[in-house]
Amino acid sequence: MLASLTSRSATSFSIIWALVSAILILSILIWLIITIFFAWNLHLKNNKKRTKYHLEPEQIKHKIIQNKTKLGKMLDFYQQQINTTATELKWLDGQFQQIDETDKKKAHQIAIRLARNQLLQQLSVKLDQKQFSQRANNELQKLKLSNLESFTNQKIKWDQEGMKSAVSRVTINEWTFNHFAGKNRVYWDYFKQVCDVDCSIKPLKDQLEITFSSWSLLKRLQAKNLFNKLIAQSSSVKMSEKLINNALQLVQDNLALQASESGNKLLKEFELSCTNTQLVQLLGFQQFYFGTNLLSLLDLSRSIAVLVRFLNEHCKWELNERLLVETALFNNLQWVNNNDFFLKSHNDLKQLHLSAEQLAIIEQQNRPFYIDAYALLIAGVKQMLMEHDAVEPKQIHFHNAKKVMESFQLFGIDQLALIEYNNCLYGFVTTKLYEIKQLDDLALFKVLFKSFLNKHLKQKFATISLFVNTQTLMI
């Protein structure tokens, strides 16, 4: 029995060992198969890579040529872009230069037409850092004269007593006045330079009654009274330069000195030179006699020529012919329109001797005293309003200024201040002189003027509009 158990046990062990051995062998075979499989796959992959990136010399050469062609095309494209950009830049530079030249020409033309010396200097500095030539200033004066000549056929002559019309009272719709002041602004360009205006406004519902009165005429009347005193003291005396100075001092203390200083200032302003003491004094004296220092050079020369004749005739002064020539032809008046005498005599001015015929020509140029600049304003306003179909001539009334002038004391008018803007003097009663030199000052001026109107017209104004661009003062 023991033997049978032993034999059974041995048989079972053999079977188990055989099974374990078989499983082990099978596992080894499977591992070998898997290893061989992965090794073969890795071999195939490496072989594929080598095959893919392996190029023959011909293939390499072809690739190089192909890439060089592409690179050449890219270089050509970018070079074309560079050339195009350079061309555009060159064109733009040309345009900028052309714009600069155009702007310079326009600015120069504008500068010639501007009346204010300060603006002329500023523009000239911006253009080419140089002062404007005398020719440019002459062109400026020429422009002023052309504006003046268009109204001479309508001017109201001022007689020797100076008592003719100096006030214009106009009743007109406010919109019409503003519209045509802007449309016909050329009319106002000269008015602003020749007229000192005290403008008062009277509201009439939707209309305005505007009264202009001549301040410069009052100054002329004041000067005339002073001259009468001078004539009374010196009518029978032949005067030397010293006696002239003494006579001028009879008119006003230190007037001769003031006249010299004013004359030199005027010479400097117009960039002129003069060594004749008498002439310099007369240049300065014109602001006392004619009531303004805003005369153009031509007006100045004419006024002085008349003044010399006046002194010779009424004061029996022996002012020589040379002085008359220098004053009448002062500042190279070769550009005066329609005057052959001035044109021909300019080149030999220093050697000029006046003939009777030439004196007659000068006499013809110089009307009694000074042309009433305010009459030009009246004529211009009248012409402007008559151009409007809705305005009939009968609506425009001109009144004699005698009562207006009598309301002022000719020797006590210090409280009438002058407000200056672009060669135009606006006057109103105040104790402080206020000068407008730039547009920023206009706001304060409007406040002052509004206060003046409220005080004198006894009516409160809500708004005040000041149209300086059309050379019109309007409420």
Swiss-Prot record:
Entry keyword set: Membrane, Transmembrane, Transmembrane helix
Transmembrane segments: 19-39
A cellular-component GO term for this protein: membrane
Membrane topology field: Single-pass membrane protein
Subcellular location: Membrane
Protein name (Swiss-Prot/TrEMBL): Uncharacterized protein MG123 homolog
Source organism of the structure: Mycoplasma pneumoniae (strain ATCC 29342 / M129 / Subtype 1)
